[in-house]
Structure formats: structure tokens, C-alpha cells
């Protein structure tokens, strides 16, 4: 009897963690045919098809987050609105598979000179925030950290100082020095920017290190942008990336489910 040889990646048979960073594009009537109501089902389809352990979203208004919460029953989320620390403004929420993970500790801080209170920092055009969680794998008992953010699109000083603050806060928050750390977000900066110098001393780049990867752009501007802007990133530590993928395929119900493509990282634990 011949053995069946199946084309299943080796990592698919092992203990992995899948992380997706997704700028879902805020809910605004100015997007014409690309308004949230026309693509919200496609965002849900993407999550159900990709089945990430962690879905880290940016630009999510509460109405959008509430829709995801109600239509993705396998997930729970942490995160607050950046404009008031409650439901106001955009959320950098972390959705996690509740069958596999539980929250041990979580929090939020603002990217400003006064990070522990709702505030706008430096030359930023908007309030900016980081949501983070310390999670326990219910099956293995292992722990990990996940941080999610969105840097300012205008303030150059704000982006630079924000990366410094994030790097420092990760050092302060992470007590479990052996636990995997994931940092996701829309950084509004190419990885070649020198703003990342302090962060690269602490965390590594999933896109660069994964043996299966791509070099595709992540910002599409609803099709108007040249596919060269790589501004969404996944950083990590204490894990082994085996796959990085820009989810730009027309397989979720419409060609563009946001003005950013989701990015996906798969890591061996």
C-alpha cells in the first residue's frame, strides 16, 4: 500500500501562532463604493478563511469593532478608543481566539509625552495609542505578549518619538523574558526608516526573517497607490517565523477589503 504524500507545510503540523495585522480603514461615508457596509462581510470572510490566533486591527471605530465581535464568535477582544479611553475614536484592538487563549493582563498607553492619560503627542495630527495583552495558551500553559499600534500619518517627530516610547514600554511591561513578543501595526513608515533603529535592537522583523515571505506593498489606496508602500509591519522576539504573507488576493468577496492589505505571520512556538 502506497503512503499518501500530502503537500502540507511542516509548520502546519506543529504548534504555531498566527498573527494578522489589519488596518481595516475607518468607517467614513467619503469612501463611496468602499464604505464599511459594503466590505464588512468581506473582512469577516478574511478572518474566517485565515483563522488567525490574533487579529490586530487599526482604525476600527466602535461600530466596526462591534460588528466584528458579533460576527466572529470564536474571538474576544481587548482595546479602548484612542480619543477618550472608552469607545471614542479609532481602536487598535487585539482580537484573540478565546478557545485557545485567555488574557492574563492587558492595558493601553498613548503615544505622547504623558502616555498614561488620553493625550496627543508631539506634532501628531491625532491621538495615537498602543493596546497590549499578556496571554496564556490554555492547552500548553505557555504565555506570550502582543502589542498593536498605529503611528501618526503627519507628525515626523511623533513617529520617531512613538517608536522610542514603544520600545521603552515593551522593556517595562514584559516581565516574562522568555515569552514570545509580537508587535503589529500600521507604522506609516517604510522599514528602512531610521525611526526603527531603537526598536530593531529589541525586536526582529517577520517579513525579513521568514523563509517563506514576499516583498509586496501593504498600502493600496483603494487601487490608486503604486504597490510599493510597505508601511504595515509585524515585529517579534522569542519565536521562529516560518511564513509571512501579504493578503492581497481577490478571494474574500471583493478585490480590496480595505485601503491596506492585511499581513500575516506564522510563528513556531
Language model features by range: what are they?
Residues 1-7:
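Bacterial N-terminal signal peptides
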Residues 11-71, 84-89, 164, 269:
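N-terminal, active-site-proximal structural segment of metallo-dependent hydrolase catalytic domains
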Residues 125-127, 138-160, 164:
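Metal-dependent phosphoester/phosphodiester hydrolase catalytic core
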Residues 25, 61, 150-152, 187-190, ...:
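Catalytic metal-binding/acid-base residues of hydrolase active sites
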Residues 16-28, 92, 104-109, 142-152:
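Active-site-proximal beta-strand elements of phosphoester/diester hydrolases
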Residues 21-41, 87, 111-125, 152, ...:
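Acidic/histidine-rich helix-loop elements
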Residues 157, 161, 168-181, 188-269:
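Metal-dependent phosphoester-hydrolase catalytic domains
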Residues 54-143, 246-248:
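Structured beta-strand-rich core segments of catalytic domains in phosphoester-bond hydrolases
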Amino acid at each position: 500500500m502506497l503512503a499518501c504524500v500530502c503537500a502540507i507545510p511542516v509548520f502546519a503540523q506543529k504548534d504555531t501562532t498566527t498573527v494578522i495585522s489589519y488596518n481595516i480603514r475607518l468607517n467614513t461615508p467619503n469612501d463611496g463604493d468602499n464604505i464599511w457596509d459594503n466590505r464588512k462581510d468581506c473582512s469577516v470572510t478574511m478572518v474566517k478563511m485565515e483563522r488567525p490566533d490574533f487579529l490586530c486591527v487599526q482604525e476600527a471605530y466602535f461600530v466596526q469593532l462591534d460588528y466584528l465581535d458579533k460576527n466572529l464568535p470564536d474571538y474576544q477582544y481587548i482595546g479602548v478608543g484612542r480619543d477618550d479611553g472608552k469607545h471614542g475614536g479609532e481602536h487598535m484592538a487585539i482580537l484573540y481566539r478565546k478557545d485557545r487563549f485567555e488574557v492574563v493582563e492587558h492595558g493601553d498607553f498613548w503615544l505622547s509625552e504623558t502616555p498614561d492619560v488620553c493625550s496627543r503627542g508631539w506634532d501628531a495630527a491625532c491621538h495615537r495609542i498602543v493596546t497590549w495583552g499578556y496571554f496564556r495558551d490554555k492547552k500548553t500553559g505557555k504565555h506570550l505578549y502582543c502589542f498593536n499600534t498605529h503611528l501618526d500619518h503627519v507628525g515626523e517627530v511623533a513617529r520617531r518619538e512613538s517608536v522610542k516610547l514603544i520600545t521603552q514600554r515593551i522593556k517595562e511591561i514584559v516581565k516574562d523574558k522568555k515569552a514570545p513578543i509580537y508587535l503589529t501595526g500600521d507604522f506609516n513608515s517604510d522599514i528602512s526608516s531610521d525611526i526603527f533603529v531603537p526598536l530593531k535592537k529589541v525586536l526582529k522583523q517577520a517579513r525579513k526573517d521568514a523563509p517563506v515571505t514576499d516583498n509586496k506593498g501593504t498600502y493600496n489606496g483603494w487601487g490608486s497607490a503604486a504597490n510599493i508602500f510597505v508601511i504595515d509591519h509585524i515585529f517579534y522576539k522569542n519565536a521562529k517565523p516560518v511564513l509571512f504573507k501579504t493578503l492581497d488576493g481577490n478571494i474574500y468577496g471583493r478585490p480590496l477589503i480595505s485601503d491596506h492589505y492585511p499581513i500575516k505571520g506564522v510563528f513556531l512556538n
